[in-house]
Every structure is written in C-alpha cells, then in structure tokens.
C-alpha cells in the first residue's frame, strides 16, 4: 500500500479509469455481438442500423484510448465486409 499522498491518489484514479474502460469494452463487445447476430439472421435493415451503432462505439472507444485506433479501424473494415456480403 502506498504511503505518499500522490501515490494514493494515483491508485484511486487508476481504479476509476479501469472501471470506465471495462464498461466501454463490455458495451463495445455487446454492440458487436448484436451486429453479428443481425448479419447471421439475414436482417439487412437491422444490420445497417446496428453497423452504424457499432462504428460509433468503436470510434468512441478509440478516442477514449480504450482500444488502439488501428484496432478500431481493422474491426470496422471487417464488419463492413460482412455487411457488404449481406447486402450484395
């Protein structure tokens, strides 16, 4: 356990940021799963709406530093390919 005041504060800050990151990652995974479920079911309209929400969530997670911007871009590209296969 830290004795220095600033170190104690850092521990508190790290806990809150870790919690925030877990919440964002969890909601991101849920959004991606909803999109994939819509693609699997073949529902084009639901997939398009879900894709928009997923892209927004990926961009938000990347801007907050929860995931790397390249990972977000890679995921968006992969999901866009799935959507294009469904609509084609």
UniProtKB/Swiss-Prot annotation:
The entry lists its GO molecular-function terms as: small ribosomal subunit rRNA binding; structural constituent of ribosome
- Identify the keywords attached in UniProt to this record, alphabetized: Ribonucleoprotein, Ribosomal protein, RNA-binding, rRNA-binding
Disulfide connectivity for this sequence is: none
Query: What Pfam families does the record tag this protein with?
Result: Ribosomal_S20p
NCBIfam families, from UniProt? Answer: S20 (TIGR00029)
**Reported function:** Binds directly to 16S ribosomal RNA.
The entry's family comment says:
Belongs to the bacterial ribosomal protein bS20 family.
Q: What is this protein called?
A: Small ribosomal subunit protein bS20
